[in-house]
Structures are given as C-alpha cells and as structure tokens.
Amino acid sequence: DRIAGEGEVASDGWSIAFPESGTSNTINWDNLNVLNAAAQSDIQNGLVDPRIEHLLAILTQKYTLDISSLRSDHSMMTASGNVSNHYYGRAMDIAVVNGVSCTDMSSTSPCSEVGRLLTLLPDGVKPTELIYGYDLDGSGPAFALADHRNHIHAGFGPA
C-alpha cells in the first residue's frame, strides 16, 4: 500500500564551488593551519596526492582547518597492520574545524558538519576512506573507529 500525504519539498543549494583539481594554489591558506613542519613540507614539495589537495581547496573555502597529519608525520602502518594511505600521501587527519576540536562529536559540531559534507561529495572527489568517532553516513564509505574520536581521517586508495 502507498502512503499519501501533503508536504513541501525543500532544497538546499550547494554552498561550495569545486575548484580546479591539481594545484595547492587553490587552497585558501588563510583557512589552513598545518600543525607541523613535516606536513607543511609535504604540501609544498608535492608529496600529497592531488585528491587530498583538492579536498583541502574545497574545504578551506568555507572552513578553517587544523590538519594534524599528512604523509611524513604519520607511521607507515595502521593500528590494524595495513600500510596507511598517509604513507603514500593519500590521506589527511583533520583535528580542528573553525576552532572547535574534533573531540566534539555532537551532531551540530563543525567537525560533524565537515564529515557529513565529505560523504556528500561526488564520486571521484569523495574520499574512499572516511573515519571518525562515529559512522557519518551509514552504508557509505565512512565508518567509526575508537582511535579516531579526536580527528576526521579522509583518504583515498590508489588512483
């Protein structure tokens, strides 16, 4: 049986434009704080995957971010024994959004907003690894790990 009812359809315009892919010049550096020199060097020396740079360019249009880990400042192996995508420059960890630590996992926190936004990006732009302290999208690519309650991990597999 079908259910009938009255209602209004609401739409929300996309408030973020997609910059051109491939160069760190599209990153709004005023909105990006890379927490250590090794990670800063990774970006400046082209050691970060262009897909990560593209995510940074998208996110720094609207949000201020503190990045706690990129490539050179992360271990080769994950806690589960796999080679980390950080090792190849294909992942980043976001520790703070708009001045609020990602330890705030409330549904209205800036980190939760960024995490949900990442799940809504189109294929090819959306991270294939998205880890936080809770599952951001149900059946999508995101999942929760207890050791990610203080940052959002966004990463990609091989191109």
Predicted regions and their residues:
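Catalytic cores and adjacent binding grooves of peptidoglycan-active enzymes
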Residues: R2-T26, D42-N45, D66, V83, ...
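Helical scaffold of the NTase/Pol beta-like nucleotidyltransferase catalytic core
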Residues: W29-L65
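Residue-level detector of functional hotspots within protein domains
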Residues: R51-E53, T78-S80, G138-G140
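Active-site-adjacent substructure of cysteine-protease-like catalytic cores
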Residues: I58-R90
